[in-house]
Amino acid sequence: MNLTLKTAAGQTYEAYAYTGGKAFDAIKPTLVFIHGVLNDHSVWILQTRYLAHHGFNVLAVDLPGHGRSGGDAPSSVEEASQFIEAMLDAAGVRQASLIGHSWGSLIALESAARLKERITHLALVGTAFPMKVSPALIESSLNEPMKALKMVNVFSRATLAAPPSALGPGTWVYGASMALGRRVLASNSQVNIFYRGFVACDSYANGLEALAAVTCPILFVLGESDQMTPPRAAKSLIDQAKTSGKTYSVVKVAMGHHQMTESPEETLNALKAFLNLQA
């Protein structure tokens, strides 16, 4: 599904959202999935397709300047949240649930804080606050992106020899993620979106204030073996949810940072329970 949006300078561009193989239906509740740094909509394929065939609209976006979306790649969480609002407006969506992974979780959080009652559920997958990125990794993403990509994919996995459970026998989640990173990086010849995304994560400072402003239930999905955003790094957000009297739940899965592909069924089941889906 392509949506026509405008840049800050007033220029139009096409933004892409994967719909799970089902036509968008304004009557159905809408789920918006937001990817992380150097990813695209495809990281959610195992959750979005199921949910699209079980009563939901699915909009798994490519952030601007990533994958199939044009426009300027966002340089901050706040800028990316403006895209989410514009995308909802363009699609004619009055209310939606937001599900974000890693950098996408911060974008979802900031968007939920800004959009208030327009957001009905907020799921933060592989989240942390602050989401600091090591200086070495930021430097490598700028000057040696292939080296940085290998580093990220090593630290993002619970094991490099995981059982082929994601897409069936023969799946190599590490190799697939490396290929995805190369493809997304090559999709933007104007800007190093690897570096820009990491800087956006590292510089975001509004997490606690944003969480306090959220008006909907919150789900945290955390990887027990996550080395990029370990469960302890989400403690400040969870504590803020408790202190602020939010309705929230925490689900831990026995995998690393890419919960959607390393533990797809567990991640889907957590989302189904959160969304009160019984099927």
Language-model segments: which ranges?
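Alpha/beta-hydrolase fold catalytic core
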Residues: 1-32, 53-56, 94, 239, ...
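Active-site loop/oxyanion-hole signature of alpha/beta-hydrolase fold enzymes
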Residues: 6-21, 45-53, 57-103, 269
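Active-site glycine-rich loops that stabilize anionic/oxyanionic intermediates
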Residues: 36-39, 102
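Flexible "cap/lid" loop of the alpha/beta hydrolase fold
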Residues: 106-152
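Conserved alpha/beta-hydrolase catalytic His-Asp/Glu region
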Residues: 139-213
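Short beta-strand/loop motif that positions the catalytic acidic residue
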Residues: 214, 220-222, 226
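Catalytic histidine-centered segment of alpha/beta-hydrolase-like enzymes
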Residues: 228, 255-268
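Catalytic histidine neighborhood in serine/cysteine hydrolases
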Residues: 235, 239-258
